[in-house]
């Protein structure tokens, strides 16, 4: 059973109406995915998460008397464009937006990137490539190349559900942008050779997508069939101690948005990696909240504070939960101006 862990964080003062416009969604990313292999066990996993980096150190054991060649993949979250694209993209590299790096037994892995574009369930990858359009459904480069296309191509893109026209006035009269609304699916893959009866170490690092909002939103009253307190309790296990710590910082006890914090959200997808033999022999998690003044809350079992900013949990014979991902809430303390 997951226990609840609550620690304190921080926020700036903004009215409720501002929160929707100052919110950045996060992209949930996980670890490596292996083609199912019942000969290989995960002897240990050491997972470290902060707003700057996710690092996973795996130790695998090939329990068979033969080498095992395994297809390994790192699936990226789907990215769907929209007229008000507000998603945290960690880097500007369209072919490695998470700054993904992996080593296998100390040697860098050369992974192959697979990218596909879908709209209304139809693969439109080759069509976009034929027009010279980047596959990323966001960014100035993509929009500029879409806008430069002949009208007949723009009409065909709209017909296929790949773009929508967005009109705006930036002070130079009305303009129309072709805005991408397709979905980009991306996965890295490579082949790994696990020697018979031997241990293998895989180290995997990337920059997380950190979402957030400019104020603390979970103290607000329920609205439009949404209860912030219940939602945060379910996702982040925000307990009474955590809530009370935030309430103590309110500048105005009658204003739930007056706590001196901003929110950061990090999602780690760990339910996709259960493709090895048996449980994880030893699992160790370290989460760093960034600053000693920040507050943090996430769901874990027997979590201990081990430093000014770090919280850790250790488990043996661990199965990642199938019914939930690791959702981390960090409240970033804002200093008075």
Annotate the PLM regions:
Residues 1-7:
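Bacterial N-terminal signal peptides that target proteins for export
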Residues 19-337:
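Lumenal/extracellular ectodomains and adaptor appendage modules
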Residues 13-15:
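N-terminal signal peptide c-region/cleavage motif recognized by signal peptidases
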